Amino acid sequence: MENNRIREEVLETIRYAVNNSPFYRTHFSTALLGELTHETFRQLPFTTKEDLSQHNRDFLCVPAEQVAEYVTTSGTSGKPVTLYLTKKDLQRLARNEKESFELTGAKAGDLFQLMTTIDKQFMAGLAYYLGVQELHAGMIRIGPGVPALQWNSILENKPDILIAVPSFLITLIDYAKQNGIDVNQTSVRSAICIGEPIREDDLSENVLAKRIHADWNIELFSTYASTEMGAAFTECRAHRGGHLNGELIYLEVLDDDGKEVPHGEKGEIIVTTLGTEGTPLIRYKTGDVARVYRETCSCGRTSPRIGPILGRKNQMIKFKGTTIFPPSIYEIFDSRSEVTCYKIEVAKDYL
C-alpha cells in the first residue's frame, strides 16, 4: 500500500464487505484480514466476473429497501450481472463524473449533449447525467442515433460538449456533409468519447480519431470505465492516458504471474472499489489489458494513468510467439474505406 490513508480506505472496504456481503464473508480467510500490508493484500483471492455472475445477489451489502438504482453490465463478455447502488453510491457516481468532466476542461455553465442511452439499466448514461448536475452544467438528453435530431439540437441549443460513441461522430459528419452543415461553424468544442478507443498503444490518435479530425476540429477525450467499478479513467487535456481517481478506486495492473507491471508496460486492470455501499468489489479482475503510466503527467497530476484498452485477456491470440488482441486487427480493416463489414475467425491450422 502506497500510504497510510490508502491502506486505511482499502482495509475499511474489506471489513465492510466481509461484514455485510455473504460472498466475501466466505471468500476471504480471516487470517489475512488483520494487519493489512502490501504483501497480505496481494494474498487475498481475486474476485472474477464468474464470481459476480454465479453469486450475484450475495455481493449485495445493504437491505433491498436501501437500493436506489439497479444497473447491469453490458454482457459483452458473458451473462449481464446486476450492480446495486444506494443513494450514497449515486453521489459517488456523480462526484466521479464531475471530476472527470473537470479533467477535460468542462466547467459550470457548460452545455452537454448526451448521445448515449440513459435507460435499460445502463450506468454510463446515468453517470453522465448525475455528473453534469453535480458540475452545475446543463444537459440535452437526446440519446443514441437519429443524426437529424442530433443536428437540430446542436444548431438550435448550441451545446459545448458532446458525449458520444466516437464512430457515431463519423455518422454526424456524413450527415452534415449531405445537408450543407459546416461542422466547424457550430458551438461544439469537444467530445467525450465512450465505448471505443481513440488512441493507439503509444497514445497517439488512432484511425477513428484521425477520421473525425480530418473533418471536425474538436477536442476528443478518451475514457475507460465499467459498470462494476462505478468510476472512470478520463484523459486530461494532455491526452496522455486516462487518470485514476485514487479516492474512488485502488488500482493494480498485473502481469500473468500476478506481479505489478512497471511503468509503461501492459497488464490486466484489477480494481478495488472505495466508498461503495451497495456492491463493493475487492481485487476485481476486469479482464481488460492496458498499459499503466506512473510518471507525473504534464498537467501536473501525479495519479497513475492507463492507456487505451488493448483487448480482453480472454480474447488474447497467441500467434507465432507474439500476442495479438482483436482490436489491433479491427483497426487494419477500419482504416480501409472500401471495407464495410468483416468477420474474424481464429482457428488452428492442422494441415
Predicted features and spans:
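Nucleotide 5′-phosphate-binding alpha/beta core
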Residues: 1-72, 78-95, 99-103, 257
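Gly-rich Lys/Arg/Thr-decorated short loops/hinges at beta-loop-alpha junctions or inter-strand turns
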Residues: 77-82, 108, 134
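Residues that mark the start of a beta-strand
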Residues: 109-111, 189
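AMP-binding/adenylate-forming
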Residues: 87-102, 111-171
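Active-site glycine/GP-rich loop and adjacent strand/helix microenvironment
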Residues: 1-16, 135-351
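A generic alpha-helix surface/boundary motif
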Residues: 22, 94-95, 126, 206-207, ...
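Generic structural marker for isolated residues within well-ordered, non-membrane alpha-helices
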Residues: 70, 97, 129, 209, ...
